[in-house]
Amino acid sequence: MKELDINGKKYELIKNVREGFDLDEVSSKLTDYFHPFDYIVGDWAYSKLRLKGFYDSKNKNCKDYNNINSLDKYIKDNCAFNCKYFVLKKNVYV
């Protein structure tokens, strides 16, 4: 796992499939909207980065559609086949 500082927030890069993580692209798209989420998933389609927030299953805000445990289903159902993607975990201990 790689620890990162992105726009003043600490994250760990816990998954980087097909080298999908691009710090410059993520920094430009990661807004305050994503701060409450425990995980940020980024996937690439048509040379565009898409971000989606997910919660840990123990988080009170967790629903079926944003539970990190459903990541594989999200990738299969909502992302381009064989796409590049990554998962960032918010570091709450900083």
Summary of predicted features, one role per range:
Residues D38, K48, Y85:
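Beta-strand-rich binding-surface signature
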Residues M1-A45:
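N-terminal leader/targeting segments and the first structural element of proteins
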